[in-house]
């Protein structure tokens, strides 16, 4: 309750932070929305008053319905301990029905796909404003698209390279910069409106509906694909509620909406006053309506806004992946914390994939106009899936009623219309967005359902009580019939409730070739919410050589298990919890600790598994993903330790070994090797 009250609170500082973090994507939409509409209708010299008024009406009512109503008014109510976003929403309702995992997986994959497209299209659109701009007398340094691409790629390379340092310092400038940006949008819009208040007819939704069926609209319903670009970024208002608070989003949105609306009004008036321009499709009304003496400053400001929008998407992608890992949608990855706040994270693997994909998209599409064809489709998918999950949440809270039914029908219809119009651009680049979404969704499906199949079909008991095997381990430790495998045999094992351990761990010690050791260590690493926690707890089960260690490490601490364990051993020997391990041959006089061997146990599917081909493939693919996702030596800080990775059979399904029939040996008593 205290968390909810804090998030509902609105403060001046909170409003500024919200403007800097939440609205980057939707705030850069004026850079390309009207340009895309004009290009789709044949160029500026072919448009008329009905088209412009209808277009602006469509933009305003799309933003009103999808951003203001669906997101700000409805979605912000569905928070999970103050956190928002599609995965937080899914976590609230996942027990309601098993099928809800599908819209969550697909929607999450679509948002991650958008994380590659947003930096590409926003930065390219901003830099394209430099093309043809004179610096001094007749000096045009950016005269072609190749130069635009070079500048764009350099900016993106710098942006992705600095992610490891976090955004704590530069993030403080986001709010003031975006505040200036939105004020600039509003002022430029007002200046270009002048006395042409007839443009306010666009506030009437009649003109929006009329345009869809008007002969002046050469694009037909496909125009919605361009219109939808005005609301991309609406999902950020929901996903970032945990960072900035519900009250600050609700309080700052009216200012942002007014500034955006004024700019679209201004662009509309400027277009109708300049329909005699010779350029058919290349003109960008956003830059064209800005006075030449401040155009360079506007490009710098637009570039900063584009970078902030991209930064917000990158940071959001890190958060989304971390949530996916917690929900077992994605395999474990190396997560770093550049600051002392756990909310600020950096995932090297995700950063690398985002950077490579984004730059590849820039090189592939080359212009922002081509990128716009791919942009938007993935977001229509995420909005539709969020609508489905929101409906289930409303039913969970309020039960089945007419209002909830009308909500899902109305907003699903709108989202499907936008998705259909975006699909009309499929062959022009939309397929790229869909391919990225499908690729990410495929990884999630394999990991989630592979885990599910494995957990449902593990033969026998997956976990056993460690305390039931302590006598056997103690006897093996003193059994001279077996050579000593190591003084200290350490298994990185997730011991649950301080006593339950995976059967495969004990299988590795006892069933393969019995591994004799002076001491058996079972280490569990627990990451805490505090940044610098460094604690451990010990349970020896009443023995001197079977030790369960629970490590509690802060999220900023390195997982250096090798270093921590040596200190723990010395502590336990000192207080006589375990026996000393004096060494006869050593370069360190008085050394009383022996050698360590660390064991990581990986699963391989046993040939005895009786699952269907599809389920067997799922589990195999899941194992491959686990092997590719993170090097266990790096994760546990064992790069310089004596470590082995063992494979143990994973037996799934019913055990029905094939019986082979015994027959009498063939009688060769009369056979001869001599040929006659």
Curated annotation (Swiss-Prot):
Q: Name the principal localization, coarsely classed.
A: membrane
- Whether Transcription counts among this entry's keywords is no
Q: Where are the transmembrane segments?
A: 14-34, 56-76, 97-117, 142-162, 173-193, 219-239, 252-272, 296-316, 345-365, 376-396, 402-422, 429-449
Per the UniProt record, one Pfam family is: K_trans_C
Keywords recorded for this protein, A-Z:
Cell membrane, Ion transport, Membrane, Potassium, Potassium transport, Symport, Transmembrane, Transmembrane helix, Transport
Per UniProt, subcellular location reads as: Cell membrane
The residues the entry assigns to the signal sequence are none
The protein's superkingdom reads: Bacteria
Enumerate the GO terms in the molecular function aspect: potassium ion transmembrane transporter activity; symporter activity
Keyword 4Fe-4S, does the record have it?
A: no
State the membrane topology: Multi-pass membrane protein
Which reaction is the catalytic activity of this chain?
Answer: K(+)(in) + H(+)(in) = K(+)(out) + H(+)(out)
Q: Name one GO cellular component term.
A: plasma membrane
The record's function comment reads: Transport of potassium into the cell. Likely operates as a K(+):H(+) symporter.
Family designation: Belongs to the HAK/KUP transporter (TC 2.A.72) family.
Tell me which HAMAP family the record gives.
Kup
Q: Which protein is depicted?
A: Probable potassium transport system protein Kup
């Amino acid at each position: 309750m205290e968390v909810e009250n804090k998030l509902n609170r609105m403060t001046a500082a909170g409003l500024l932070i919200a403007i800097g973090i939440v609205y980057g994507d939707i705030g850069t939409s004026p850079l390309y929305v009207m340009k895309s509409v004009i290009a789709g209708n044949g160029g500026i010299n072919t448009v008329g008053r009905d088209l412009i008024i209808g277009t602006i009406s469509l933009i305003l009512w799309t933003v009103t319905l999808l951003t203001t109503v669906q997101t700000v008014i409805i979605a912000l109510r569905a928070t999970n301990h103050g956190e928002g976003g599609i995965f937080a929403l899914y976590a609230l309702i996942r027990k309601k029905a098993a099928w809800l995992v599908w819209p969550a997986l697909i929607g999450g994959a679509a948002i991650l796909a958008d994380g590659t497209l947003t930096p590409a299209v926003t930065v390219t659109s901003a830099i394209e404003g430099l093309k043809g701009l004179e610096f001094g007398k007749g000096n045009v340094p950016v005269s072609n698209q190749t130069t635009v691409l070079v500048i764009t790629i350099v900016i993106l390379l710098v942006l992705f390279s600095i992610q490891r340092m976090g955004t704590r310092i530069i993030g403080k400038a986001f709010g003031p910069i975006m505040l200036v940006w939105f004020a600039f949008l509003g002022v430029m819009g007002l200046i270009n409106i002048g006395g042409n208040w007839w443009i306010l007819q666009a506030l009437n939704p009649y003109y929006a509906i009329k345009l869809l069926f008007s002969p002046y609209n050469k694009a037909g319903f496909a125009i919605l694909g361009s219109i939808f670009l005005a609301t991309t970024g609406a999902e950020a208002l929901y996903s970032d509620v945990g960072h900035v608070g519900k009250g600050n989003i609700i309080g700052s949105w009216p200012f942002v909406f007014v500034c955006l609306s004024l700019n679209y009004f201004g662009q509309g008036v400027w277009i109708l006053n300049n329909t005699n321009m010779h350029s058919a499709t290349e003109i960008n009304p956003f830059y064209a309506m800005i006075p030449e003496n401040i155009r360079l400053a506007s490009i710098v400001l637009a570039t900063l806004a584009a970078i902030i929008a991209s930064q917000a998407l990158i940071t959001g992608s890190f958060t989304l992946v971390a949530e996916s890992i917690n929900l077992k949608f994605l395999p474990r990855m190396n997560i770093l914390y550049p600051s002392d706040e756990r909310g600020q994270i950096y995932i090297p693997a995700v950063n690398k994939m985002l950077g490579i994909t984004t730059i590849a998209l820039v090189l592939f599409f080359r212009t922002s106009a081509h990128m716009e064809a791919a942009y938007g489709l993935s977001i229509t998918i995420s909005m539709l899936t969020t609508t489905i999950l929101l409906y289930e949440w409303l039913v969970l809270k309020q039960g089945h009623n007419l209002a909830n039914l009308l909500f899902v029908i109305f907003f699903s219809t709108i989202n499907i219309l936008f998705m259909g119009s975006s699909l009309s651009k499929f062959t022009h680049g939309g397929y790229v967005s869909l391919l990225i979404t499908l690729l990410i969704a495929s990884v999630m499906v394999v990991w989630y359902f592979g885990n599910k199949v494995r957990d449902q079909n593990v033969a026998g008991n997956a976990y056993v009580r460690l305390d039931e095997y302590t006598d056997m381990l103690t006897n093996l430790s003193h059994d001279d019939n077996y050579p000593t495998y190591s003084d200290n045999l350490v298994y990185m094992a997730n011991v649950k409730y301080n006593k339950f351990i995976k059967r495969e761990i004990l299988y590795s010690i006892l069933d393969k070739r019995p591994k004799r050791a002076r001491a058996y260590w079972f280490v569990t690493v627990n990451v805490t919410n505090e940044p610098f926690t460094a604690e451990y707890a010990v349970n020896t089960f009443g023995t001197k050589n079977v030790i369960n260690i629970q490590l509690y490490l802060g999220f900023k601490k390195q997982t250096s298990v090798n270093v921590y364990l040596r200190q723990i051993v010395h502590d336990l020997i000192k207080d006589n919890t375990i026996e000393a391990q004096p060494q006869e041959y050593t370069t360190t006089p008085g050394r009383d600790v022996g050698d360590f061997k660390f064991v990581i146990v990986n699963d391989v599917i046993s040939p005895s598994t009786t699952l269907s081909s599809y389920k067997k493939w799922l589990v195999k693919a899941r194992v491959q993903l686990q092997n590719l996702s993170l090097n266990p030596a790096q994760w546990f800080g064992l790069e310089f330790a004596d470590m082995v990775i063992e494979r143990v059979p994973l037996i799934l399904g019913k055990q029905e070994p094939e019986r082979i029939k015994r027959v009498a040996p063939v009688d060769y008593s009369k056979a001869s090797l001599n040929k006659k």
